């Protein structure tokens, strides 16, 4: 498999990645903890993993591997919803057939509008519609339905990355780098949500049963009581 793992890193323990059969490229955040890998680049501690992903794409645009697995750096997380370790998920990906494969097994339906401030991950609200047009994405009908693959960890082909001009990647990088602190979170969440649209080209991710060599059951936000049921207020 012509695949490279690219990981964003700040405080995560990356020892588990030493077992990888694939090359590992590290993009550090400023102030990151020491780790077992030599970073290729260091970026400001902004934009969560998104800034690191964009940095890698910009710096390696002319010599990308056949496929890139973009990951956050932690071996386990609430959004890892396959029944096996993340490395096994990457190893089982059917990249011979598919050019974009989300790795979290976590999907969310979303209407094309600006969401009120009700998500812990986006206390300022999720400005999908506002940012969609501000950043030059093509028109879509108001209120149309998206099916998204959030918490951006995915495998994507060189072909799909190169379908976006390098100057666009640079623009998106600068937008996050230079935004106000108030806008940083909603911009990061926006790119976290729409990475699937950028690479897959569809508003509704087309979930495939043979994305992986193992069987899996897709997990949906609206069917998870831990996300959809409001927590009781503390008194």
Please identify what each model-predicted range represents.
Residues 1-235:
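ER/Golgi luminal nucleotide-sugar-dependent glycosyltransferases, focusing on the catalytic module
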